[in-house]
Amino acid sequence: MILSLLIVALALLGIALANVLGWPAVRQATTGRPGSVSVLIPARNEERHLPACLDAVLRQGESVREILVYDDHSSDGTGAVVEFYRQRDPRIRLVPARPLEPGWTGKNFACAQLAAAAQSEYFLFIDADARLRDRAVDSLVEEMRCRNLQFLSCWPGLEMVTFWEQALMPMLNFVVFSIFPGPMSLYMSHPSLALAHGACLMTDGRSYREIGGHSVVRAEIFEDTRLAQLWRARGRRGLCLDGQRVIRVRMYSSFDEIWRGFQKNFFPAFKSEISFWAFMFFHALVFLAPFLWLGVTNDWRLWICAGAILSTRLLLAARFHHPLWAVLLHPLSQSILLALGISSWWRCKRGHGVAWKGREYHKKAAAPQRD
């Protein structure tokens, strides 16, 4: 058993090393050839985040033809923020909100309304808490053209301020890039190798309309990677690249926000309950058990296994600019991750669904319910 764990831990270290060395980042724009881009921002109670987001978009230059914001029935001052910025720049438009239709999640419905109103060659969907770097839009357009893509997602840099952000948020990249073979996705088009981050999705408008876009994944809570899989399944070329140079995001700002945010996505991310429990068992056995067993045995293979896991964390921390001290908290972070998964599963199994921004969703969304 211990030897098997050691082999698996070393193999996963190899995958992480391949990602660090072979997974490409979005390149800075060099041609100066502008595109025609609609920046599409779904916003629900984003009064706090939206000003910085819009400021960053307005610095992008002439490639941005229009900036559309969908105020999804916010109860704060989101609409007033959009109106203030609209008076500064006529490219900004507020897309009128419609009642959420049965069978849709709120974000998917908002994105579909934004896409229906967009008029540019390219659609760039970004979250309201995302911050585009200078010339980010030009860089994305250039990647779309140079790589002949119809779908591009950027994995953003993570802004982390509080203790719990720095301790827990790096687990997102650890979970993904310790098992996802990023370099393989460049050369193989199978949908299983699709990956996306919902904070930054770019597609050309033509393929979006032909495929159906968010309407095809209307009930999905984990819609970003589902969209990436859909594009590949329909014969389009899509990639996810390291986007730290072009976009950053502060996803959550407290332990409570982290818990509720990942509780929303955790169990729904899996196609079946079997795959969910396989993931949970794998993470408990490979990434947590070696540290627990070291408390009762001094087997040298366990020390190497634990060292391989921490080395994986260190590699990814260096690539994604995470605080190195958080690596030492790996057993705690891994335990919280597993508790999050069980919590997400339990809510869905008991029919409570997952609450997010005043709505409650079930694994396959029906009509949302107000909290």
PLM segments and residue spans:
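N-terminal membrane-anchoring/stem segments of glycan-assembly enzymes
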Residues: 1-33, 170, 182
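Long helical/loop segments within the catalytic core of UDP-sugar-dependent glycosyltransferases
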Residues: 11, 93-116, 143-210, 259, ...
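Short, well-formed alpha-helical segments that are part of the catalytic scaffolds
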Residues: 22-27, 46-59
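Cell-envelope/extracellular polymer assembly enzymes that use nucleotide-activated donors
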Residues: 35-38, 66
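Acidic donor-binding segment of Leloir-type glycosyltransferases
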Residues: 54-101
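Acidic donor-binding/catalytic loop of UDP-sugar-dependent glycosyltransferases
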Residues: 77, 128-143
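Catalytic donor/gating beta->alpha subdomain of glycosyltransferases that bind UDP-sugars
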Residues: 144, 151-176, 206-209, 214-276, ...
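Membrane-embedded multi-pass helical conduit in multi-pass membrane proteins
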Residues: 277-352
